[in-house]
Amino acid sequence: MNKRTLLFVSLIGIAFVGCQIFFGYNEFRSCKNLAEKQRKISEQTLAAVESVGLSVASWDTDVNGEEHKNNYAVRVGDKLFLLHNGEAAQSVYSSGESWSFVDHKCGFDNIHLALYRQQGSSFNPTNTGKVFLPTNHEGLPVLVVEFRNNKEPLVFLGEYAQGRISNKDSTIFGTALVFWRSGSDYIPLGLYDSREEKLVSLDLPITRAVIFGNDQDSAKSSDTANHYVLFNDYMQIIVSEESGSIEGINLPFASTNNKSIVNEIGFDRDLASEKSPEALFPGLSSKLPDGQQAKNSIGGYYPLLRRGLLSDSKKLLPLEYHALNVVSGRELATPVALRYRVLSYTPHSIQLESLDRSVQKVYKLPENPEEKPYVFETAITLTKETEDVWVTSGVPEVEIMSNASAPTIKYRVIKKNKGSLDKVKLPKVKEPLAVRRGVYPQWILNSNGYFGIILTPLSEIASGYGSLYISGSTAPTRLSAISPKNQLYPVSKYPGYETLLPLPKDAGTHRFLVYAGPLAEPTLKVLDKTITQEKGENPEYLDSISFRGVFAFITAPFAALLFIIMKFFKLVTGSWGISIILLTVFLKLLLYPLNAWSIRSMRRMQILSPYIQQIQQKYKNEPKRAQMEIMGLYKTNKVNPITGCLPLLIQLPFLIAMFDLLKSSFLLRGASFIPGWIDNLTAPDVLFSWQTSIWFIGNEFHLLPILLGIVMFLQQKVTSLHKKGPVTDQQKQQQVMGNMMAILFTAMFYNFPSGLNIYWLSSMILGVVQQWITNKILDSKHLKNEVVLNNKKHR
């Protein structure tokens, strides 16, 4: 090898070694920085959890020797957990105290977890239980204590999801002990093998957390979990043994129970006719107080709460979104306790207790449901001091109003001895949880438009409220089961919303009154009266009924007036459809003088039209002069060109008010006018339907908007019958505009409620009749074809 080659090889070798040293040093520095960051996070986390009884301590087997710095254990109250190989010592010493051996569990690779109890403590190994946790789609928040290379363990917060423990700030390299927080206690969940990414459950004589599907006991419990039914004439409540919460609230139809005011609508009939599982009630395997299984029936009820899709077990509503659940965690979607046992059960009440004895719940229907329709009470008892705990409302089912859903959240507060109702801005997908502090709601409403869930605290609670966005795929609506191939009601279009109220951190019992039913004047009035008599204060539940819309502040008085008149006509005729027609007649008679005056003014405008054209032709090069001459002509002949628009402008508030009324009045929901065609005044009429959806039209043919367009077209023809002489360009433009308006209104009203179409169609027909009659009268008596021009009369 010559010198040049030797030099080249040497330089290459030096460069390679230099690169290795450089990159190795950078990697070493990076690892060192990461270790320092992890240690800092661990110290902060450990400082936070030490306040609630979890700490890391060294231990030794010799009472006279110093505690070994490389032996570490996790202390939780009067229990000590430590990892060991081989046989466990019968006693150890830690924190200057003696600890006695209780039991141990083999994890993996000859790694054992031993359990010790503090000498003289009240810990009873036979008094144990299990806390069953759901497989949360967002991941369960856990506390991880990682043992690494005989060093002081790292403590950090992580998430358990699909068998893996993850943390954004730290990668798990060693063996870890995983805990789940239940209230103010940390309950061991398992031993985590980072190499196999496997969580081994701990079969130790202590209260422990169990993931459904990861433990034989939990799987067995899940399969045999029951539901229990409470019922009266107004509601059917389904209580879940797994969550200890309410999985379903079903309201009977008026057709099956004369005390109910809930009518069956098209969606209910469609699901029942298809014998869909979504139309089964109670729908879930449920027990009755006599121990018998509740029999499912097809239809007969309206499901107030979303149940997911009963036809697909994978699409059932997750346990954390059940109503009256007690939750905590970062997203307020982690139940504080799961898996309950029933302590007592009657047709009208049930008492449950969580297996870890941290939560007790009582659900009770009223003794006199006629005085408290659609109401029940719940009492939630927390046996331990627990921070950041909330109670949930559940997720209401979807109601369609004018081809869209209308979820609403409101709460009532007392300000300066006066009650006020405030509307809550709905949370969005990017920020699903919205929490507001510093307010004390008297009650909070979670509504789908026609129905609502009102939570009223009967005992003192913490300040604030929360609202939670839940994706439609997580909480699918029953409507998605209607024509799923055509995707008429895709789950992505209908997210759910949940309201939450905070509980005090102290142990104690917290009581709530729950209204779960229609936002209807009759029932809310009765409830207001009953509560006022009991408490001496009116809760004003009736305020939860409000008229919606951008112009509600203008149209609300009109809507209230229309509803009063409609109720009178309903009392006389017994039909809401006829009452809408009579309301239209009443308004036409009321506004007749103004409409007649407007028609007379329009007739004069038609007579002046040729003279206006002459002026425009004469002064075509002097537009200002032409405008002055035309205005003078109007003034001389006592004509106001704006008066022709007045009837439409005056009717507009009534039209919008009627639209708001149909979206707000529960009594009109499901009200039939012509069976088989107009079955629901708050939904479009359906003359016939088909399977395949067509753009804009959908899969239903609505006749009323077509009739409306025809009547508007005829109205233009009636108006043009009295125009004499050649048709001017302006008149041609008016005819074209009139025809376009007829087409526009047909398209605009196509998916509007049938009640609104009946109102506007009746108004248009009466308008045509009125115009024809008025024209006849004007032709014979009131209007001469005379025009004053230059102080001279012309014919």
From Swiss-Prot:
Subunit comment: Interacts with the Sec translocase complex via SecD. Specifically interacts with transmembrane segments of nascent integral membrane proteins during membrane integration.
Compartments where found: Cell inner membrane
Keywords attached to this entry: Cell inner membrane, Cell membrane, Chaperone, Lipoprotein, Membrane, Palmitate, Protein transport, Signal, Transmembrane, Transmembrane helix, Transport
GO biological process: protein insertion into membrane; protein transport
GO MF annotation terms: membrane insertase activity
InterPro entries for the chain: Membr_insert_YidC, YidC/ALB3/OXA1/COX18, YidC/Oxa/ALB_C, YidC_ALB_C
Listed CDD domains: 5TM_YidC_Alb3
Lipidation (N-palmitoyl cysteine): 19
Cited function: Required for the insertion and/or proper folding and/or complex formation of integral membrane proteins into the membrane. Involved in integration of membrane proteins that insert both dependently and independently of the Sec translocase complex, as well as at least some lipoproteins. Aids folding of multispanning membrane proteins.
Lipidation (S-diacylglycerol cysteine): 19
Protein name (database record): Membrane protein insertase YidC
Gene Ontology CC terms, in alphabetical order: plasma membrane
Disulfide-bonded cysteines: none
Similarity remark: Belongs to the OXA1/ALB3/YidC family. Type 1 subfamily.
NCBIfam families in the cross-refs: PRK01001.1, yidC_oxa1_cterm
PROSITE patterns assigned to the protein according to its UniProt record, in alphabetical order: PROKAR_LIPOPROTEIN
Positions of transmembrane segments: 450-470, 549-569, 571-591, 642-662, 694-714, 741-761
Signal peptide segment: 1-18
